[in-house]
Amino acid sequence: MKKIMFLGGAAHQVPALQYAKSQGYYTILCDYLEDNMGKFFADKFYCVSTRDREAILTIAEQVCIDGIIAYASDSALETAAYVSEKMSLSSYTPEVVSILSNKNLFREFLKNNGFNYPKSKSFTSVRDAVRGLSGFKFPLIVKPADSAGSRGIASIDHISELGPVFEKALSESAKKIVIVEEFIETTTDFMVGGDIIIINGKIEYFGMLNGHRDVKKNRCIPVGNSYPTFLDDEKSRQVQLEIQKVIDILSIRNGAMNIDVIFGKNDQPYIIEINARNGANMVSMLLKKATNVDLVGLSVEMALNNAPNAINQTVSDTCYATYYLRSYEKGVLERINFNSRITENIINMQMYKSSGDEIEPFDGLDKIIGILLFKFENQEELKYKMAHMNHYIQVQLVGQLQTRDGESSLCPLQVM
């Protein structure tokens, strides 16, 4: 029986554990939280930080694992790469993970290899940043060099706004490095995102998605994804060529990746991020519905050095989307009101909060209340409803006044 170690047992990581169990693999889970959901699906659980690579290596060697995976987790990627290298397992190299996981190193990589990139600079103190940003054009994006889930990311329009934004970003960085870069004005309505699968050094699967943003509240943080891509064929081809170029330079053979790309005013693609793991927040579920490819299963199999020779995918005429339930105010969740014109589109739902739970203002993906998976008849319906979701869904906190009539209970959710 093959043994596979999972780094992280959060709710969004459970599907990978479930897949491994369904295939008869022995599953070992490591997580620093004792009350994680994943331990109920694992054969063996160790309460240990996934950032403690020596402790993880010791356990991995004792158990004699055949593979290790940090499914949809940035924080444990470097540990997985370290253990894999020490035990000659199938994974990305530590060098590749370091470049892709640290935004300052990735910007240098892009610059040194002829890619498009925004003007940027890294700092360890706000004092140095104020001095070092002369010549930069506003607006600027300020973000931790090594955080995940869009934590600590914000835009500023004037240097006077830098102080608190910089300190917030610094607090979210494990390495205490903040990167500041010029905002890329885009020619498209959406970012380009999605997951890819690499086999024998080539992209064999490209699940390209539209990345939705709430530009009125925080243009830096995603609020959902949709399929199919709104890009034309030429722009889609450009994105794939740019990502393949990164794969070639880094000599990547096999693996799953999550990407973010923007087209600038010059109509050229700018790679914002490439993450050396699957996308979180129901990306794999969305793409499985849309393309009939099990990205979760593929990632587990590749961690065990069982990469397939080819991937068979279908092209769906149906439109799918995810949407992140959130509140921009702090409070206690009372209920969520849904208009009947949107409930007809919901095909799956993952809730992370319940009525009575404390809710923090949405400033990163760790503050998501829940995620909805939608099915739409066509792109027109998808675009309209995703752009006007506040007309269909309302997160109501205790003490807030209702603004819609005609509700019927779905407790703790409620239909308008």
What positions do the PLM features span?
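ATP-binding N-terminal substructure of ATP-dependent carboxylate-amine bond-forming enzymes
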Residues: 1-95, 127, 309, 327, ...
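Conserved hydrophobic helix-helix packing surfaces used for dimerization/oligomerization
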Residues: 3-5, 140, 203
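A conserved helix-loop-beta module that forms one wall/lid of the active-site cleft
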Residues: 85-152, 159
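Conserved ATP-binding module of the ATP-grasp superfamily
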Residues: 116-119, 139-142, 155-191, 219-225, ...
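Beta-strand scaffold of nucleotide-dependent catalytic cores
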Residues: 154, 164-168, 181, 190-212, ...
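A short glycine-rich, hydrophobically flanked beta-strand micro-motif that places a catalytic Asp/Glu
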Residues: 181-182, 253-265, 404-413
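Active-site "cap" helix and flanking loop/linker of ATP-utilizing ligase/carboxylase catalytic domains
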Residues: 237-259, 265, 275-331
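Glycine-rich active-site loop/lid that clamps phosphate-bearing ligands
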Residues: 325-355
